Amino acid sequence: MTEPANNHPSPPPQNWLFKWWNSLNAITRLLVLVLGAPLMVLNARALSSIFGYFESLFVISLIASVIAFLLNYPVAWLEKQGAKRFVAASFVFLTALIIFTALGVTLIPLALSQAQQLVARLPDWLDSGQKQLVLLDQKAEILGWPVNFDGLIPQINSRLAAELQNLAGSTLNLALSLTVFTVVRLLDVLLTIILTFYLLLHTDDVWQSIIGWLPERFQKPFSDTLRRSFQNYFLGQLVSATCMALGLISGFLLLKVPFGLLFGLTVGVMALIPFGGSVGIVLVTFLVALRDIGMALQLLAVALVIQQIVENGIAPRVLGSVTGLNPFWVLISLLTGARIGGLLGVIVAVPSAVMIKEALGAIRSMKPLVPAPDHNQDPLYFKNQEEVQPLPPRP
């Protein structure tokens, strides 16, 4: 018997959420949006209050998780070479602890010393910047350029003096905060170290206990998406920031830029955050321009060349695409993370946005079980059935 021909194109499968939304009329959709928006705001407010109450616990857990996540890659490589998990985790953890301790003992005191010297010399740099503006105004007047800095110089003078006072106060507060941190928050540091080592030993067990709360069909996609998002972002930013700091420190020292170590480390640390490297370069260029505009232009040229080499040459070759997000959404996620969680929110904002993007894409492409077609509601089916002639009976 010939099967009936179906001329209707099969509709693309839809997720149950989209099917439910399409089944609503316009008034119901409006009511859902009107009632859902306040609930989302209340939930966000409640989550913010909970986060504020358990902020210390969340910060310790998140920092330990990120460090353990990054250290897990050399541990996994050592396991593939035949080492046991405990031996590999202990070796990697102790090596990382020694490296961080060495950096903290050598580079951080030098950077803090240069920061104190910079604050002490800023008034002299401010006077030098004013003199350079006066000379620039005189040259513009000689050349006949329609530029007048007479009214601008006093405004810049007062504004920079106010910013200098704020910077000095911020430096003093930072020093006091670091002192209080070393005395009061020592327990948090110890807890972070212990939790990092524990997570490094039992990464798979802890992770399986977390994703075990999800439905079984969501566990592997969620795990792969989260690992890929955080891996690409944190490793990408870490490689870029390290290369940026090393390159800038070397370039600044060759140019004999004052406080080259401090400026290179500052830009490198700021490069851990998207767009932070560019902001750091502009800030350092402005500070050096107060002392010498010619040196500032050389510094800017070297910094831009190193930044382009790192961002467009080294990082893509090592890790490929880092986020896959449009720069606009990267900026929005950073602002949102800063508003919700401060510095901690900025750190996890971009990988969280990447994970949300991947999750939404997975939901849209999800193929639910499509029920069998109901031929009772298809008039073309009966028409095709009438056109089909039955075969004659066998003799």
UniProtKB/Swiss-Prot annotation:
It is a multi-pass membrane protein. GO terms for biological process: transmembrane transport. Signal peptide: none annotated. The chain crosses the membrane at residues 24-44, 50-70, 91-111, 180-200, 245-265, 269-289, 295-315, 328-348. The keyword Zinc-finger does not apply. InterPro entries: AI-2E-like. It comes from the Bacteria. It is found in: Cell membrane. Keywords: Cell membrane, Membrane, Transmembrane, Transmembrane helix, Transport. One of its GO terms (cellular component) is plasma membrane. Coiled coil: none annotated. Belongs to the autoinducer-2 exporter (AI-2E) (TC 2.A.86) family. This is Putative transport protein sll0063. It comes from Synechocystis sp. (strain ATCC 27184 / PCC 6803 / Kazusa).
